[in-house]
């Protein structure tokens, strides 16, 4: 299985980079992982709603240009479906069974995802009603994908 994570914004914190490197290494047993970092657009403090929409659209275009036609796109969005770790494991398994072996998880920037990206999405996933920094969320997503593969393979994992 091929898994791509498209994330808007540059990872700055060393401890997060170390965590991502660790989960990337762990995941290499189960899938081919590709992480794409896209440059985020600067959002002025006094940005209007219109300005924010323009910024989301610019970031959205970068995301859409990075998505290949054969990818099954899973957006991470507050309006998405919540799943347990076990349900995510089954979901990833079912994607493979249905021939969707190129999964693409999309993490938007600080303003979220554009309508165009949400329309391109095959599935929308929500981790929580809470808001997380998108840099930290990348680690959380990798951990859950790793956990999903462990569950799927009947291997021990922390409950």
Curated annotation (Swiss-Prot):
<keyword id="KW-0698">rRNA processing</keyword>
<keyword id="KW-0949">S-adenosyl-L-methionine</keyword>
<feature type="binding site">
    <location>
        <position position="108"/>
    </location>
    <ligand>
        <name>S-adenosyl-L-methionine</name>
    </ligand>
</feature>
<dbReference type="InterPro" id="IPR003742">
    <property type="entry name" value="RlmH-like"/>
</dbReference>
<feature type="binding site">
    <location>
        <position position="76"/>
    </location>
    <ligand>
        <name>S-adenosyl-L-methionine</name>
    </ligand>
</feature>
<keyword id="KW-0808">Transferase</keyword>
<keyword id="KW-0963">Cytoplasm</keyword>
<dbReference type="GO" id="GO:0070038">
    <property type="term" value="F:rRNA (pseudouridine-N3-)-methyltransferase activity"/>
</dbReference>
<comment type="function">
    <text>Specifically methylates the pseudouridine at position 1915 (m3Psi1915) in 23S rRNA.</text>
</comment>
<dbReference type="GO" id="GO:0005737">
    <property type="term" value="C:cytoplasm"/>
</dbReference>
<dbReference type="InterPro" id="IPR029028">
    <property type="entry name" value="Alpha/beta_knot_MTases"/>
</dbReference>
<comment type="subunit">
    <text>Homodimer.</text>
</comment>
<keyword id="KW-0489">Methyltransferase</keyword>
<dbReference type="Pfam" id="PF02590">
    <property type="entry name" value="SPOUT_MTase"/>
</dbReference>
<dbReference type="InterPro" id="IPR029026">
    <property type="entry name" value="tRNA_m1G_MTases_N"/>
</dbReference>
<comment type="similarity">
    <text>Belongs to the RNA methyltransferase RlmH family.</text>
</comment>
<feature type="binding site">
    <location>
        <begin position="127"/>
        <end position="132"/>
    </location>
    <ligand>
        <name>S-adenosyl-L-methionine</name>
    </ligand>
</feature>
<protein>
    <recommendedName>
        <fullName>Ribosomal RNA large subunit methyltransferase H</fullName>
        <ecNumber>2.1.1.177</ecNumber>
    </recommendedName>
</protein>
């Amino acid at each position: 299985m091929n898994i791509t994570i498209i994330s808007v914004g540059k990872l700055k914190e060393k401890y997060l980079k170390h965590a991502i490197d660790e989960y990337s290494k762990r995941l290499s047993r189960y899938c081919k992982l590709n992480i794409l970092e896209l440059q985020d657009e600067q959002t002025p403090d006094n940005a209007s709603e219109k300005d924010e929409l323009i910024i989301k659209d610019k970031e959205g275009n970068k995301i859409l240009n990075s998505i290949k036609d054969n990818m099954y796109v899973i957006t991470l969005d507050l309006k998405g479906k919540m799943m347990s770790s076990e349900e995510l494991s089954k979901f990833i398994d079912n994607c493979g069974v249905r021939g969707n072996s190129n999964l693409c998880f999309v993490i938007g920037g600080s303003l979220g995802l554009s309508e165009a990206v949400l329309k391109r999405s095959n599935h929308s996933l929500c981790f929580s009603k809470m808001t997380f920094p998108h840099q930290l969320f990348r680690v959380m997503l990798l951990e859950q994908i790793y956990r999903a593969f462990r569950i799927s393979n009947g291997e021990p994992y922390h409950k």
